Amino acid sequence: MSISLFSSTPSVAVLDNRGLLVRELQYHRHPDTPEETDERITCHQHDERGSLSQSADPRLHAAGLTNFTYLNSLTGAVLQSVSADAGTSLVLSDAAGRAFLVVTGAGTEDAVTRTWQYEDDTLPGRPLSITEQVTGEAAQITERFVYAGNTDAEKMLNLAGQCVSHYDTAGLVQTNSIALSGVPLAVTRQLLPDTAEANWVGEDASAWNDLLDGETFFTQTHADATGAVLGITDAKGNLQRVAYDVAGLLSGSWLTLKDGTEQVIVASLTYSAAGQKLREEHGNGVVTTYVYEPETQRLTGIKTERPSGHVAGAKVLQDLRYAYDPVGNVLSVNNDAEETRFWRNQKVVPENTYIYDSLYQLVSATGREMANAGQQGNSLPSATAPLPTDSSAYTNYTRTYRYDRGGNLTQMRHSAPATNNNYTTDITVSDRSNRAVLSTLAEVPSDVDMLFSAGGHQKHLQPGQALVWTPRGELQKVTPVVRDGGADDSESYRYDASSQRIIKTGTQQTGNNVQTQRVQYLPGLELRSTKAGNTETEGLQVITVGEAGRTQVRGLHWESGKPAEISNNQLRWSYDNLIGSSNLELDGDGNIISMEEYYPYGGTAVWTARSAVEADYKTIRYSGKERDATGLDYYGYRYYQSWSGRWLSADPAGTIDGLNLFRMVRNNPVTLMDNDGLVPYPRTRRPNSNLHEPKIDTEKDRDIPGQSKGPHLKNMTVRSFAGTPVSLYSALGDNVLHREALLTDLINKSKAAMDSETTSILENKEGGILAFNAIKLSNNTGDVFNALHIVNKKTTEFQQGPGAVRAYWAPQGGYVDIPVHPHGGEPELVFTPGFSGCVFVADKLSENTIRVRHVEGNKEDAQYNDESIDHGLGMIEAMEYKHYGYYTDENGIVIENITGSAFMRYEREAGSDRPGKWKIKYQAIENASNILSIQELRSGFINKKIELTQK
């Protein structure tokens, strides 16, 4: 790696006089032309209230275009979003801040309008239904919510007031029992017939039930008192069981197939003090060990082996060694378990190397591929079976990549001289957006946008292969083969309310018959069937083990049509690499079933198996995702086309990964991975997860090198401010937080009157729920602040103002548990005291619960890092001292600031009805003011003044 390529290429953020980001400068250099530097400027504009109104990347800005244009409300909420990639969306909320109306593809024939209906004012205001209407078609009620009452029977099952029947786009989900911790213990799923559409009209639930298929699927969950899941019994009676150590980390897991004996999946695990896995021993006797770089804790080694004494004999099966550059980009991967081979005067080393440009985009990669490999497309090459032993199996390849100024991959060039496997894949990018297709679909940039829907969904996979999408932007059908006068080959999909795939059906013409392959996805279970005409030829249960350490374990149980070459109830252990790709498959005896290697952006470079039949049952491949018959990789919220290195549709999470909504993992697919099709993550997070290891900085690690202490202001003045109660959300908008400090001084019984119930919650280390509003403070010199204020029995009518909003409270040095996805009127905010050296951090305790902690300064180890503290599945997000405790002055000097404020808010993406995410919002407050007291002064009319100390 040439260090000079990266020298003098900083990322620069330019702020206006309001402190708002208006320019982002990056400097691009390519290793082939290091003497050439391209300054790339991303431009942003804000309206008079400080809300973002326009954003343009370097490529579109140069053409006088924008990536995004926003119309914002007075509170800073986005009402209209016009995206070059994803089209126009309209979002309206009701007076309570709830979703009311969303229009996607607005202004086009593809427009879809969704509206929400709620309970009336005499009830908690929970959602009752969602109505969906495609332009020119009749409206359909696509979701219904039915809630439990308050009977003794319902209370016994903890169902009172809970949504117990959710009629969604796939059918019906019924919750039959809930633990005190909020974990659903018993859930039943019924499906609509494959050809039926969801339309839950009328008010008669029995009529809705008549629309459903007769078969029901019951899943039972076993949890402890803390909400940790101890086991799952799937819809076919297979039991998965897990155990945890005293730190709450996985210590073992087991699987019992129905009517079978319990089998060990994970026999033991060893962790470091930081919670990182050091060693795993699996039920097949195979051991995987992990090595980390001491300074950075980056994973540098993954070794999988049959140890000495194993019944199949000792053998190193995979030994991956990673090397990184200083910022964490992967430079090379060696598999020391594989031999160096020689063929046609070339040395074929089991090694991959990578080169990056100054923006850390991958520009060159080398590796090995099968000697019979051809040009990569959407078809899967045949596996070499049995496992090869000669040196003619592999040859060297080089791939180079080119990108435009908007981050679009425009060309991939492949070279394997020894086999003459040389080709170039060109990608045509629109001149008005970041939409792009293979040049075989369009050669002229102005033609590209016609191949996408208004919402940014690609209409054709390959020439002649049409794509159909649901009104919610989910891929509904792919037609790989179209026949005149005959049945087409197709693959179709159905999704649940959270846009997760629940059914996949593929049809293929074979001679005079139609073969149908169907997959139904249930918790911990896939039901796969094959039919020839109307006759079932195969029925297969695939049990997907949820807790198997870093591996993925799948059990294959045939109910009918078992291949003679495979034993029934076969367990397959899949061992991955840094980004989760399935490299190595082993059976229950620790023997190799298959081995697979991938090109950087996906696609199979090497694939060998001990039998072709066993190879056919491998479905999990690149990045640990399922590969469909279409060649697409299914990630959860999107589909990925590896042959062009692009997503098939615009990012439903919006600009969470930048202005380019089609770019794959920032064009760095070796270092970063995407868990569900929304945002890339470094693989330093917990394996098979988008969660961090639970560790926050302590002592000197909290500091920024070269910082200076801020001035100590001895002179303080006491001034009076006029205060007016305002809507809480008006003080929490991003544009408001940019310019007005949010103070928490009034959340103090010595400064504001509060009742005993409120005081007990404030002092409870496990937090609770309180009602809040905000008070806007101003004086005649133009100073403006906002202060959080608790509304309780002692709050005067005037101070209550426009009302209150319920929110969770996380006390200093304590925590509060909140739902991953609030529903049924649960709060969507978390407040906590102000910060002066403290840390705000959120852990995912279970699939349903998040624990939010306010960790006190200099107590990081005792209150968070200690091994005895329960972190559940791992850290979601943290606001540490580095984030708010420093600022850069006009001379570029980093000054220690000390104080800040923070809260959490559950946010849904504008224009989407998908579940949202909790996000931490915080301020760094320079020379923060302190509120001394609050009092109401009456002089002919009621007003209020707040006295505060201003440094």
Language-model regions: role of each:
Residues 591-607, 616, 631-632, 637-638, ...:
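Short turn/helix-capping motifs enriched in Asx and small/polar residues
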Residues 694-707, 867-951:
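Active-site or metal-binding loop neighborhoods of secreted/extracellular toxin and effector enzymes
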Residues 817-895:
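Catalytic toxin/effector domains delivered as secreted proteins or via bacterial secretion systems
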Residues 675-738, 742-744, 950-951:
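Low-complexity, glycine/serine/proline-rich disordered segments
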Residues 1-42, 47-48, 216-218, 224-228:
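Thioester-forming pentapeptide GCGEQ
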Residues 202, 563-636:
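A motif-centric feature for acidic-aromatic and gly/ser/thr-rich catalytic loops and repeats
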